[in-house]
Every structure is written in C-alpha cells, then in structure tokens.
Regions:
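Short active-site oxyanion
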Residues: 56-61, 146, 221-223
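Short phosphate-binding loop-to-helix
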Residues: 67-116, 127, 133-137
C-alpha cells in the first residue's frame, strides 16, 4: 500500500500528489473486466503499478464499489481505505464526481490537502510511467499550467452530425485532403491514459482546465480502451507483440 510522504514544506517541489484510479464492479460490455487477468496480473493492477513506478505519487488510491477489486488493487500496492457509494458507481455516473468524492475522502482520512491529482483509467493500460512523471513535473515547474495530459496524434478528418441531420466537417480551416505529412496534426485528448491536474479543478467538478499542456504521443496501442471482449483481445495481442519486440 502506498504511504503518504511524512512531511511537506511550501514550494512546487513539495506539492502533494495523489493518483486516483476509479474502477467500479459493474461492466455491461465485459463483466468483471477490472479483475480479468491480462499480462500476468488483474487489469486494475496495471494502472496501480504504473502510478507507483512513476515515482511521483504520494498516494495511489483506487476508488471502487467492489470488494474483489479492492483486494486486487491493494495486492498491487494501492490504498483502498473505503468503498465507493452505490450512487457513484452507476452505468451513467460521470467521472468528475467520482474523482471529487475520492479526493475529499482521502484528504479527510489523511488530514492533508493534495495539490495535484493524477487521473488514470484502469481500462487504458498502454502507458509509460514516465508520462505520469512528466505530467506532474509540468505542473510543479510551470505554475501557469493547470492540467497536463497525454494526447494521441492523428491526421484523420472528423465530421459531426448537426441537430438537423446534416454533417459538418470539424476544423474546416485544415486542408481537406493531401499527403498525411503535409497536414497539421490533431491531438485526441486521452486523459485516462495519463493526466495531472490542479486539485482545485477536481473540487470544482472538472477534470481538465483552461491552461493545458499536452504530452504528444503517436502510439497506436495506447488507443486501446478496454470495454468489451474484442478490446480485451486486442490488448492481449498488443502485449504479446510488445513482449516479443522489446
């Protein structure tokens, strides 16, 4: 179990950092997914290990409504001092109130205020601990930034359907077609892979801010977000490929 740092003085280097990993028991697309074994450990354990290995988190907290997930997370090194209330573990529960609840309960138990929150989604396992460390370091060294997260580069064209059924191309200031290398890339926000934000954003019910910094990646595997059996199969295949090619 991660233990809190004994003492903190003022200054950016002494900022208290807590990683929060939300993992509820209910899953319609892939029942029991957070406990399914993947690469030799339960799915939930991957994110716990990444947070610990980043070396920047004073606490690694898993918020769950499920005793089995709680036990698996604890075995991986997480802090799991409470079970999440049922009303915050429904199919349509947004992430923001879950993070706020976890932060407030952790602070009440620890008797401290955390300055930076690291948010990790357990269904996103293709991350590097270094990305977490970079996100936290950005907030510690750049006070003008309120959040830092991973974003995947893409050169694809995006469209949105309007209320009247018509279609509008997003970002029509870009050249519509042409060689991929000549087009300005877009970056898809992937906060669940790795993100760090000022705790006041969480207290305000937000998980991104207005003054962001992005960790740019171009990583196909990190786009795998495990929600159903096919996603899980892709993750298994990607892990095997990485194991053979590293």
């Amino acid at each position: 179990m991660t233990e809190p740092t004994a003492s903190h003085n003022s200054g950016p280097d002494k900022a208290r950092v807590i990683a929060i990993i939300p993992a509820r028991g209910g899953s319609k697309g892939l029942p029991g997914k957070n406990l399914k074994m993947l690469g030799g450990m339960p799915l939930i354990a991957h994110s716990v290990v990444h947070a610990i290995e980043s070396g920047v988190c004073d606490r690694v907290l898993v918020t769950t409504d499920n005793e089995e997930i709680r036990a698996a997370a604890e075995a991986a090194g997480a802090w799991t001092p409470f079970l999440r209330e049922a009303e915050l573990a429904q199919d349509l529960t947004p992430t923001e109130p879950v993070l706020k609840d976890a932060l407030e309960r952790a602070e009440a138990l620890d008797g401290v205020s955390y300055d930076i929150v690291v948010f990790l989604q357990p269904t996103d396992i293709f991350r590097e601990p270094e990305w977490i460390a970079r996100a936290v370091d950005t907030l510690k060294t750049r006070p003008e930034i309120d959040c830092c997260f991973v974003a995947n580069k893409t050169h694809k064209n995006f469209w949105v359907q309007e209320d009247d059924g018509s279609w509008t191309r997003v970002f029509d200031w870009m050249a519509i077609y042409g060689p991929r290398q000549t087009r300005k890339p877009l970056f898809r926000e992937d906060t669940g892979i790795a993100s760090a934000l000022r705790s006041e954003l969480i207290r305000a019910g937000r998980r991104t801010g207005d003054k962001a910094e992005i960790i740019q990646i171009d990583n196909t595997a990190s786009g795998i977000d495990i929600h159903d059996a096919f996603d899980f199969h892709l993750a298994e295949t990607a892990l095997e490929w990485r194991k053979r090619n590293r």
